[in-house]
Regions:
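N-terminal transmembrane-helix/juxtamembrane module of multi-pass inner/ER membrane proteins
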Residues: 1-38, 69-95, 223-242, 251-281
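Charged, low-complexity surface patches
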Residues: 19, 61, 201
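Membrane-embedded catalytic cores of phosphoryl/pyrophosphoryl-handling enzymes
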Residues: 27, 42-43, 56, 66, ...
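First transmembrane helix
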Residues: 37-46
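Interfacial segments of alpha-helical transmembrane regions
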Residues: 45-65
Length: 281
C-alpha cells in the first residue's frame, strides 16, 4: 500500500462502516454518471433538445477528458481503496484510482455550466452536481480523497483550456471546408486516443460522430438551435428515448465499440430527423 493511502483508508473504512443502508441505492445510481450511458444520454439531450453545436462540444470535451484521465491513471498507477481493502468497496473497478474520472468529469461539466450561464441556479445545480458525484466516489469505496482532489484539479485545468481555446478553434474550423473538418474529426481524436489505452468505444465514437456531423450539416438533418426550455426538454427526452431504442436493437449483435459507433451515427442521421418529424407533425 502507498504510505499516504494508509490514513485515507482509515477514513474510507470508517465511512464504509457507517453507511446508512437507505442511501446505498442513491449512491449506486450516482455511479451511472461515471459511465458511457451518461454520455449517451447527455449528448443527445443537448444535441437534439437545444443545440447540435453544444452537443458536439460536449462529446469532444468528455472524450478529451477520458483521454487525459486514462493517461494519468496509467502514469501514476495508484490503486483504489477497494483494491487495498475489498471490504470497503460497494463496487470495485479494475482500472487505477488516481485521478478520479468521476470527480474530473463532474468538475469539468459542473464548472462549464456555471461558467456558461453564470446564474444562481447554474451555481446551485453545478455545485450540487460536483459535491454529490465527488462524495459518491468516496462513499462507494472506489476512490481515495486524494484521487478526488486530483480529478478536481484536472477537471478545472481542462475547463480553463476549453475556455481559452474554444473560440480560436471554432473560428479556424469555420474558415475550413466541410470536408477538411471531417478529416480533422478523424485524425485528431484517433491520434490522441492511440496515445493511451482509453476505451476503444471512444475511438469509434469519435470517427462516427464526425461522419454524422458532416452528413447532418451537408444534408440539413440537424434541428435548429432552441432556447425554449420546455420545447428543448421534450425534444431532448425524445432523443434519449430513441437512443435507448437504438441501443436495445444493436446491443448483442455487435462488439461493444461498434455499438457506440452505430449509436453515434444514429444520433445525427436518425434521431434528429425523427424528433423533428414527431415535434413538427
Amino acid at each position: 500500500m502507498i504510505p499516504w493511502h494508509c490514513e485515507q483508508l482509515n477514513f474510507i473504512s470508517s465511512l464504509a462502516n457507517n453507511r446508512p443502508e437507505f442511501l446505498d441505492p442513491l449512491f449506486l445510481f450516482l455511479n451511472y454518471f461515471d459511465s458511457p450511458y451518461f454520455v449517451m444520454a447527455l449528448v443527445p439531450f443537448v444535441w437534439v433538445g437545444f443545440s447540435w453545436r453544444w452537443g458536439l462540444r460536449l462529446f469532444y470535451l468528455i472524450a478529451a477528458s477520458v483521454v487525459v484521465n486514462t493517461f494519468f491513471k496509467e502514469l501514476v498507477g495508484w490503486p483504489r481503496p477497494c483494491a487495498d481493502c475489498p471490504s470497503v468497496g460497494m463496487l470495485c473497478l479494475k482500472s487505477f484510482g488516481f485521478p478520479s474520472g468521476g470527480a474530473q468529469t463532474c468538475m469539468l461539466l459542473g464548472g462549464l455550466l456555471i461558467y456558461t450561464w453564470k446564474t444562481r441556479w447554474a451555481w446551485i445545480v453545478g455545485v450540487s452536481y460536483i459535491a454529490l458525484i465527488s462524495f459518491s466516489r468516496l462513499y462507494l469505496g472506489v476512490h481515495y480523497p486524494i484521487d478526488v482532489l486530483g480529478g478536481w484539479v484536472l477537471g478545472l485545468g481542462l475547463l480553463w483550456l476549453y475556455v481559452r481555446t474554444i473560440g480560436p478553434i471554432e473560428q479556424f474550423l469555420h474558415r475550413q471546408r466541410l470536408e477538411a473538418c471531417l478529416g480533422l474529426s478523424f485524425v485528431l481524436p484517433i491520434a490522441l486516443m492511440l496515445a493511451t489505452t482509453s476505451p476503444h468505444y471512444f475511438r469509434v465514437d469519435a470517427v462516427a460522430i464526425g461522419i454524422g456531423a458532416y452528413l447532418s450539416l451537408k444534408w440539413g438533418l440537424y434541428l435548429a438551435d432552441n432556447r425554449d426550455v420546455r420545447k428543448g426538454v421534450v425534444r431532448g427526452v425524445l432523443a434519449v428515448g430513441l437512443m435507448w431504442v437504438g441501443l436495445v436493437v444493436v446491443r448483442g449483435h455487435l462488439p461493444t465499440p461498434w455499438v457506440y459507433g452505430v449509436l453515434a451515427l444514429w444520433l445525427s442521421l436518425g434521431v434528429s430527423p425523427l424528433v423533428r418529424k414527431i415535434v413538427c407533425s
